[in-house]
Amino acid sequence: MRKFLLALLLTFVACVAFSQNATYFGYVRDANKKPVEFANVIVVGTNIGASTDASGYFEINVPAGQDLEVQISFLGYEPFSQKIKLKPNERKQVTAVLNEGAVMLPTADIGATSERQVSGTRLNPQISMKIPTTGGFEDILKALPSVSSNNELSSQYNVRGGNYDENLVFVNDIEVYRPQLIRSGQQEGLSFINPDMVSSILFSAGAFEPKYGDKMSSVLDIKYKKPTEFGASIMASLLGANAHVEGTSKNHLFRYNVGLRYKTSRYLLASMDVSGHYDPSYVDAQTFLIYNVTEKLELNFLGNFSSNKYKYIPLDGETSFGTVSDALKIRTYFEGQEVDRFNSGTAAFSVNYTPSNNLSLKFIASGYYTNEEETYDILAQYYLNEIDQQLGATTGDSVSNIGVGSFLDHARNYYDGFVVSAKHIGTFVKDENKLDWGVQTNYENYSYHVHEWTMNDSADYSLPYSDNAVLLYLTDIANIGLQSIRASAYVQDSYLFKAEGADVSLGGGVRFNFWSFNKQFLASPRVNLSVKPTNWKPDMIFRFATGLYHQPPTIKEARRISDGTLNPNLKAQSSAQVVVGMDYNFLAWGRPFKLVAEAYYKYMYNLNPYNVDNVQIKYYGENIAHGYAYGIEAKVNGEFVPGTESWVSLGLMRTYEDIENDFYTRTVENVVDTVYPGYIPRPTDQLVNFGIFFQDYIPKAPTWKVFLSLHFGTGLPYGPPNSERYMATGRMKAYRRVDFGISKQFNFKKADWIKDFWISLEVFNLLNTKNEISHTWITDIRGRDYAVPSYLTGIRPNLKIVVKF
């Protein structure tokens, strides 16, 4: 593999010699006919390029008699491209006009000045079709320095020290919900977002505007396409298949955007340590319909149905762990099976009314339903052995058996949810002033039944041991329901103006929220400011944002971990956030780049502590903690290779919490001492998050492209089950993953109905790294406890074919 990669890299540096040349020259202007300095001019697929001077002028020599494509780009503007074929010694002049817009990068677009004044990152949904990924669109989010996820099987993600439940997701201004009974990435299917149907995506990692709801960590704002012409696509791989079609009626009054997806992770799961029969099946169908009644009145419908089924019959597994001096191996044999089902549906009707160019009104009525079932009975019998790891040992044979035992896991969990929502949002724009407002009411009806337990038999003794009864190791039982009403409203205003030597954007507003279950009324004021110096030559913008962010509980958060009952006095978790940042557009090696850096601090109060196992979160159901999170982040996007965009990102973060009134006692030399743990790491505390995405093409053969993604994240805290949070003193191994892909694009000149056709070969987990996701605790014959790691997927190749019409 190393020799192959080395040969591939050497191929990239090959140069093309041209015997006859022509000249391509001209000027680059913006929409106001002003010259664009430092615009990047390249001949696609070659190393030929130049940058414009102060007058916007450029001149390049190109090979004569060949079909070439010239691309002109500058950060913050839509690229200009032109296909040419020049005669020997011919001089061709052009005036290229660049319009302000978005230059899509793999992880973010570099928007125009107006876009850069709003805190957030624009993402390209189509890049998920090209990069090697085992998941869906969310893998693009995981490339950002503020986002962490140590599980390639899951679409869930943490943002700046928050957990999975602290992230907002909107599609066409409709909130998207995630499954509640999911406990592992193996159970997860397709996320709501269908990249084939998406037109724009905005992600904010914190300190977002009042219009974006009531969560503490992040918001993902997605808009689906309103097509203007016919289009379709088909994708097939070893992990599933997608198809989508979009188009309009002849009079363009009716438009449609429909997608169908199928996914199976059986191929991936076969690379895990536990062998067995995996039978996952995930199906998702979506439709977005648009009808223009008049020029000012538009009707929309968004529908989604998702069916995820997961059947699992484990057979046996073998896991090695420990250290060089204390190497261990556990062999496990299983009986039983797990059968899960997750069905959900969404239907939303909206009316968009634009009475004038200044005023826009939208009315939405939506409904969401979910039905989830998780059932399993699995008996696991294990044998724990010490391994011979002395120098010269080649077999790794067992030296001695130090533990024998079994686990019996049982669950009958059911969750039903129904949400009906009515919402109105409006926007009024006057000159440089923009006013937004909105009101919303939700009716929620949930039914939540949990019945699960674990029996632990170690060396013929049931743990915990009792002379009088057989006790269960873990139990979780609840039978609860909840009907409630949520109401919210917001108003915000933003104003653009010129100050001495700077363009300034100032925005602010307040959000209100009320929940009938706990009778709590909340107000969340928020302010943001951006300044772009105009008397500086560097193209830089500085940003500041602050505000209060409240997260009203859900039924899952309100369920007490102690007895499974609902806590009607549970308050919203809250945080005060401050974010300062800057972004800087610059040229390096004559090519465009962008640096984005941010620092943040969050003080959190009324926290509801929780434990995490794999992707399952269980809350205490009490406001008994306060904490903080702080960090710095930096990301550089740009053309490391001419004509292609790559990135590198780094995030440093700490998040701690102090659980009130927690303590333990210890005895030292017959003296009993009371210890108060104080601030302890939160379950999402991850010091370093580092990522690279790199893409390249073969000179003289630009239809061959190579993609490489790398992710490194330091270990997360963990501790034994049924223990206090301060006992989570262990750290998982660092998450390390490299994914590689190579693709070939084909052009069918005779079949012009095929717009794009490409085949890619992907290699997931190229280095075959064993990444931990959770631990199982067992006891040996000496009474010592061991945390046996559960590993994620190993190396796996994948073949993918994409056709666009």
Segments from the language model and where they lie:
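Short, acidic, small-residue-rich periplasmic hinge/interaction motif at the N-terminus
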Residues: R29-A31, A39-V44, Q71-Y77, K87-K130, ...
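Short acidic/polar hinge/loop motifs at secondary-structure boundaries
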Residues: E59-N61, K130, E175-F203
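Transmembrane beta-barrel wall of Gram-negative outer-membrane proteins
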Residues: S233, L239-Y262, S275-L315, E338-F363, ...
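Face-selective signature of the C-terminal outer-membrane beta-barrel domain
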Residues: N292-S307, Q337-N518, V596-A599, W647
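Surface-exposed extracellular loop regions of Gram-negative outer-membrane beta-barrel proteins
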Residues: D316, P533-V578, A599-I624, S709-S723, ...
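Membrane-embedded beta-barrel scaffold of Gram-negative outer-membrane proteins
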Residues: K362-S366, A572-E639, I759-F764
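Gram-negative outer-membrane beta-barrel transporters
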Residues: L496-V504, Y601-Y603, N623-P720
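C-terminal beta-signal and adjacent terminal beta-strands/loops
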Residues: S646, H711-P721, K744-F805
